[in-house]
Amino acid sequence: MSLTIEKSFITYEWASKLTQAAIDHATTLGLSICVAVVDSVGNLIAFARMDDCCLIGIGTAQGKAYTAARSGLNTREFLIYLKENEVSLTSLQDEKLMLIAGGLPILYQEKLIGGIGIGGGTGKQDEECAQIALQSLVLFDQ
């Protein structure tokens, strides 16, 4: 039996690349967003707020990234899971959870290494920006 466990975390270098990829995509959509990238336990690694992004986007981006990292699920899917299983948000006892679309877990070699959250657009737009950013990881890794 092992006395310790090993965890993997996304690096700042990759977190900043994800942040920029999300911003680049938001720009093509004509959006101003906030982007947060957290490690696998929900601690902030990188954050950016585009000019003219609404202030509420700051908290929602961070909350979505945190939720995706802590649950290991897309935040939209996590909400569906909770509803289908009749789990109340208060029973989770975590006030940082943000159960709206726009947060995705970051996986590397099938391990959860972090979460990305976008705030400032609609849930669908935020999720799209996060998804495009994650797809860019493959491009950066070549």
Residue ranges and their predicted role:
Residues 1-142:
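Flexible, solvent-exposed loop/hinge segments and secondary-structure transition points
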